[in-house]
Every structure is written in C-alpha cells, then in structure tokens.
C-alpha cells in the first residue's frame, strides 16, 4: 500500500474509532452497557489500527512515528482491559494507563510539527489536532483515577472523549488535503 494512502486510511480509521469511543462514553446514550462496551472496544481497535498504519506510513524514525506507535500501544492496552477477564480495578488501571500512553503519544508529534521555518495552515491544524487529542486522553486518564477513588468521573471522561475525537477528526481532515 502506498504510504500516503496508508497515512490517509490510518488517519480516518483512528478518527472514526475515537468517535465510536466517544459515543460509547456519552452518558445520555440509549445504548445498554454491553453495547457501550462493544462500541468502546471497536473504537479502540480502530484507533490502534489507525495509529499503527500512520506510524508505518513514515519511512524514517521521527517523534511523530514514535508517537503514533505509542498511541497504538495505548489503545491496545485499553483493549486488553476490556477483553481480558481481570478484576474491575485492574481493568480500570489498564484503561487509565492506556489513555495516558495515548496522551503522551499525541504530544510526541508536536516537536516535529513545530520544527519548521514556515508554519502553514495545515501544520497549525495538525498542531491543534494533536493538542486536542493529548488533552482529551489526559482527561480520560484523570477521570479513571477519580473513579478509582470512588468519586464521579464520568463527565470528565465524556468531555475528554469528545475533545480527543475532535482532534482526531481535524487531523484526518488535514491528512485528506495532502
């Protein structure tokens, strides 16, 4: 597969996955708990696949490539927490760690994006997208920590999920313009 096509497909796969996961985290959703879990699982699998494809589309080792790999690892960590029959605390910890790995992965692309003499509008949108994804994932991780302490963190998770989805969508749109 051509690297540009791989990056484009990976970008949209990841964006659609984040939207599915955000829908799953929406409190007023009409889906039952099983459907929400399945949507979140599918969303995280799509995000992991998309990030892996985006990383594979880059020939050279860059912070952006490493960041995409780290995001794929983070999503895979969340997936393992959903699929493997651990106790609830272990599942929550895997989700927290997976979200925080994704946050760091999104942030790792920023130095590459900022390392230019002339910043275009596409570069600015990519920066915004990466920042939004990093912030959204960090909020999701924070919500998990809050919930582990027995407090209500669902609203923070909801907001973080949609912030991440907006960032991924922006980056997919930029990739489409290339």
Language-model features, listed with the residues they occupy:
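Glycine-rich, hydrophobic membrane-spanning regions of integral membrane proteins that mediate transport
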Residues: 1-131, 138-162, 169-178
């Amino acid at each position: 597969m051509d690297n540009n096509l791989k990056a484009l497909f990976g970008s949209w796969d990841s964006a659609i996955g984040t939207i599915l996961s955000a829908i799953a985290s929406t409190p007023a959703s009409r889906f039952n708990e099983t459907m929400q879990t399945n949507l979140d699982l599918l969303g995280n699998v799509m995000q992991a696949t998309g990030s892996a494809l985006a990383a594979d589309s880059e020939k050279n080792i860059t912070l952006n490539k490493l960041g995409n790999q780290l995001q794929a690892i983070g999503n895979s960590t969340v997936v393992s927490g959903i699929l493997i029959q651990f106790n609830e605390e272990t599942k929550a910890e895997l989700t927290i760690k997976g979200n925080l790995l994704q946050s760091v992965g999104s942030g790792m692309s920023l130095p590459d994006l900022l390392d230019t003499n002339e910043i275009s509008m596409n570069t600015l949108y990519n920066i915004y997208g990466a920042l939004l994804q990093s912030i959204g994932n960090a909020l999701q991780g924070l919500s998990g920590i809050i919930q582990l302490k027995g407090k209500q963190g669902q609203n923070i998770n909801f907001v973080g999920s949609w912030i991440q989805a907006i960032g991924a969508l922006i980056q997919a749109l930029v990739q489409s313009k290339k």
